[in-house]
Amino acid sequence: MMHSSSVRRMITVKWSLCLIFCLTNSILVSAKHLCLPDQKDSLWGFKNEFNVPSPHSYAMTEKWRNNTDCCSWDGVSCDPKTGVVVELDLQYSHLNGPLRSNSSLFRLQHLQKLVLGSNHLSGILPDSIGNLKRLKVLVLVNCNLFGKIPSSLGNLSYLTHLDLSYNDFTSEGPDSMGNLNRLTDMLLKLSSVTWIDLGDNQLKGMLPSNMSSLSKLEAFDISGNSFSGTIPSSLFMIPSLILLHLGRNDFSGPFEIGNISSPSNLQLLNIGRNNFNPDIVDLSIFSPLLSLGYLDVSGINLKISSTVSLPSPIEYLGLLSCNISEFPKFLRNQTSLEYLDISANQIEGQVPEWLWSLPELRYVNISHNSFNGFEGPADVIQGGRELLVLDISSNIFQDPFPLLPVVSMNYLFSSNNRFSGEIPKTICELDNLRILVLSNNNFSGSIPRCFENLHLYVLHLRNNNLSGIFPEEAISHHLQSFDVGHNLFSGELPKSLINCSDIEFLNVEDNRINDTFPSWLELLPNLQILVLRSNEFYGPIFSPGDSLSFSRLRIFDISENRFTGVLPSDYFVGWSVMSSVVDIDGRIIQYTVTGIDRDFYHKSVALINKGLKMELVGSGFTIYKTIDVSGNRLEGDIPESIGLLKEVIVLSMSNNAFTGHIPPSLSNLSNLQSLDLSQNRLSGSIPGELGKLTFLEWMNFSHNRLEGPIPETTQIQTQDSSSFTENPGLCGAPLLKKCGGEEEATKQEQDEDKEEEDQVFSWIAAAIGYVPGVVCGLTIGHILVSHKRDWFMRIVSFFT
């Protein structure tokens, strides 16, 4: 785990509070056969309103039986005296479908606790929710709900806990400010509420100035929205408030806490990533918050005086991107500090030696500054005996590489520095190391064989000068992400990767690996990204008689190698994820590493999209589905099964020796944005069906043997002519070459124009011969106005 128990308690305080609220309001099931018939009917009707993908062991409603006591059903609790349902907790139950306004749920009038979190309700939250007048706890987190938050929630006078986070609720409408006012008015009516979480929605507007009227409020989270205006100082006047999370909004300055008359109980405050700039906030403004243990002011221009002090129990401090130019000296006295993030500032020089003597320090992120070394001896960091996470990436550190705490270190990030020489063998002594990122340095030599002692989940050595054969024994079977791209590795791809059943990301691009296609990788059930680009792989990319099936692959890049052979027509049949939005288990694919925040380390892949090289990072991995086999020696027909991959966004098969026709099945790729079939030997015509691909922005058919007219569709006609050049038989726009039918029609039209021209010219000549000059002038003027032809203008200029 990343933090000690005290920091974990601080970071997860809102979840702890949530548990307390839920347990406080919980009523245990007692005697059997207490369920009233109308209650059972309402529950059974509610169950039947939703679809549940089968089979799902976590779907509680699938275990309900109509011939049993409903008070014994999973997720249901009844009042032991009356038999009415008072609690319904069906979170993570795979319920699919809208929550209807006439749902049987709303007949459960005695319901006090309703938890439907992490289901796929997908619709609006109906006003009928306000009919559950006795409701104390309402949790609809992550339910795919959207639209306005119903004002009827203000009728729930007993409500103490409201969690609508991670949905798509908005303040939009004909009167968005009016909608927001109704929302805030509704919140202010909840006089008993102790917990409000509206985080990660799409709400906007300003908070009311009289927030202190929520006198019992203990937790208020509206992070990840678009609220604006100033943060009302009345929030800090609520003596019961423990958690206040306003981060990732559009709040602006000035920021004031106000005069706090009674001791503050606030323990967690996050106002980071707002729009206070260019306003400067003095860090000392937080000094009166004596109970504060978690403070995140990331993204705010801070003034940190030499005499500033924060409450001594501060354990979590987020100072990311605060325009700090000097290492904050007040941290020296923060003996309880466990989590420190001062990344993305403007700090230069050496990291102070005293930092590593803070006894509780677990997480340090000093990345994206201009540090060039460490004060003290080579083993200075080993003074931080409890250090779990160290991020020193994107600085100008150079040799020697620091010695690290042997026992505690879990995650090490040191990319984008100036370290050189061999990778230090002292890293092999870090028994608990799980993530190692040394990308974008100048390391050279081979991989230390002692890596076999490590149990890594993530190994990124990208863009160094490492060489030699990658040792088989250095591959941890725990690996989930492996990136050694842009080095000088040679030999074969390590076969020990076959033992990495959890691997999702595999990138060996731009090395000198000389091997046949690793078809055995299809046995890795979680592989999503495979990049073999720019190596010396050779031979066919399939084995005769075997069907290749990369069921979860979303990025397949084997370009710029020496692969050969013909692809069978069914080559892409087993590529399930590229054929569908969901994977074979019906789950949305997301790139994750078990137990690891995926934002902790940088993953990147260089892709060719629309003819340009781009770097794919972050969320791009969950969006892009790409196939690139360009720059090889593949031949024969393009497999017809390519049409099954309807989710593919980028498809490049250029610079091969493909023959035959362009398969019409390509028109099934409804999400395709970029198509490159250039530099092959394709013949026949360009299928007109491709013009129906509304997202297709870029295509290249050049340097083939295509013929016939270019389809006259908007998607194709808007392409540059270079996308069709070097196809001798192609004709029509955007090429200058006219098609045969067009040339014949044009010639006939020109002949008709010439005949008409000759007739009119004969008439003019006769008129000139018989009519005096004045009449001739009038006649010419009349014809000029009537016909306005270019040739006639030339004749007029001749006579004048």
Swiss-Prot record:
Transmembrane annotation, as ranges: 760-780
LRR repeat residues: 109-131, 133-156, 157-179, 190-213, 214-238, 240-262, 263-288, 294-311, 312-334, 335-358, 360-383, 385-406, 407-430, 431-453, 455-477, 479-500, 502-523, 524-550, 551-574, 621-645, 646-669, 670-693, 695-718
GO cellular component: plasma membrane
Glycosylation sites: 66, 102, 155, 210, 259, 323, 333, 365, 442, 465, 499, 514, 668, 700
Record topology, Extracellular segments: 32-759
Secretion signal span: 1-31
Gene3D superfamilies for the chain: Ribonuclease Inhibitor
Top-rank taxon, per record: Eukaryota
Keywords attached to this entry: Cell membrane, Glycoprotein, Leucine-rich repeat, Membrane, Receptor, Repeat, Signal, Transmembrane, Transmembrane helix
PROSITE patterns: LRR (PS51450)
Protein topology in the membrane: Single-pass type I membrane protein
SUPFAM superfamilies: L domain-like
InterPro entries (UniProt xref): Leu-rich_rpt (IPR001611), Leu-rich_rpt_typical-subtyp (IPR003591), LRR_dom_sf (IPR032675), LRR_N_plant-typ (IPR013210), LRRC69/RLP (IPR052595)
Locations listed in the record: Cell membrane
A Pfam family the protein falls into: LRR_1
Cytoplasmic side: 781-800
SMART domains the record matches: LRR_TYP
Protein family according to the UniProt entry: Belongs to the RLP family.
Name this protein carries in UniProt: Receptor-like protein 47
